[in-house]
Amino acid sequence: MNTRAKAPEETTVVVGMSGGVDSSVTAYLLKQQGYNVIGIFMKNWDDTDENGFCTATEDYEDVIAVANQIGIPYYAVNFEKEYWDKVFTYFLDEYKLGRTPNPDVMCNKEIKFKAFLDHAMRLGADFVATGHYARAVYEDGEHKLLRGVDTNKDQTYFLNQLSQDQIAKAMFPIGHMEKSEVRKIAEEANLATAKKKDSTGICFIGERNFKQFLSQYLPAQPGEMRTLDGKTMGRHDGLMYYTMGQRHGLGIGGDGEPWFVVGKNLQDNILFVEQGFHNELLYSEGLYASDISWTATMPAGTEFRCTAKFRYRQTDTPVTVRVLDGGRLDVAFDERQRAITPGQAVVFYDGDVCLGGATIDDAYKAGQALTYLA
């Protein structure tokens, strides 16, 4: 059922406002279009830094400034407990398994389009809106998630876990725009955030050193760094600090090509490294994935063709997907891929339509798993 039939003046939209330019323009455009707009600032993390400065305070002040400029009510809502339980705990659990998680995917699924969506519905909202570069449309009896028009900013990779019900209640007013156009609108409207820099990185780490941050929550277990033929190359600081294909921070000197992480032995706490960017051990023919979520109807049959991304801003890769027993997928690549990373998302597309995604368990070549080596 298409839920977008009411006139704007009869429709209440709650906008997730972060204090950035994208969500500011989102609220501004909806107000200009005649919607009843409410701005909500989500406080998901106690992000006071070592000097006692809380970046959320500055961000909320920017939300207040923009909300007052465009004439909408605003509130702050605390989702710290939900974020800890659903996102941060998952983040730590994945690192314990030697994987590299993507908390942004989980945050969208569990916080922005669940806890926040539920809160908005209790306020009487018809929709929630965010400043994501994506599009939500109703076609052929389904609510579909489409890529943002700005291919460099498209964020469907991070929205791959959204369900039909979540997409049905979502609005992405800047999804049909280029980033430069969004900035221009903000500047012409003289919004307080018009010249504010985009935030980058994981929200709860911010500008802090990643190793120092993670070590506050997980005890590091240093161990041996070896080649696959058993030559010791040094010591690692803890397997959780390293990801497939990583080059920097290994501390291996000498002549010749750089060294890269090619695998882990979790049981014996060994990090495997080999030399050369194009080392064969970094390339795989496919991957196994689990925790599958389809944004729309799952493609028919137990095998289908589509394209996929294995990291944000990657060019789409043609793949063949086979549905295995036990809720797993076998994703075979048309062309070999480098440094596939367990814990990250594999996201599937049919043209501009995001079909859904899953969590990468491991990569394989000639039927042999590559990452977790005994």
Swiss-Prot record:
- Residues annotated as binding ATP are G16, M17, S18, G19, G20, V21, D22, S23, M42, G131
Q: Name the principal localization, coarsely classed.
A: cytoplasm
Q: Which reaction does it catalyse?
A: S-sulfanyl-L-cysteinyl-[protein] + uridine(34) in tRNA + AH2 + ATP = 2-thiouridine(34) in tRNA + L-cysteinyl-[protein] + A + AMP + diphosphate + H(+)
Does the entry feature the keyword ATP-binding, yes or no? yes
> Which Gene Ontology cellular component terms are annotated?
cytoplasm
**A GO biological process held by the record:** tRNA wobble position uridine thiolation
Which Pfam families does this one have? tRNA_Me_trans, tRNA_Me_trans_C, tRNA_Me_trans_M
State the EC number(s).
2.8.1.13
Q: Where is the active site?
A: C107, C203
The protein's job, in short, is:
Catalyzes the 2-thiolation of uridine at the wobble position (U34) of tRNA, leading to the formation of s(2)U34.
Member of which family? Belongs to the MnmA/TRMU family.
Question: Protein name, please?
Answer: tRNA-specific 2-thiouridylase MnmA
What species is this protein from? Answer: Exiguobacterium sibiricum (strain DSM 17290 / CCUG 55495 / CIP 109462 / JCM 13490 / 255-15)
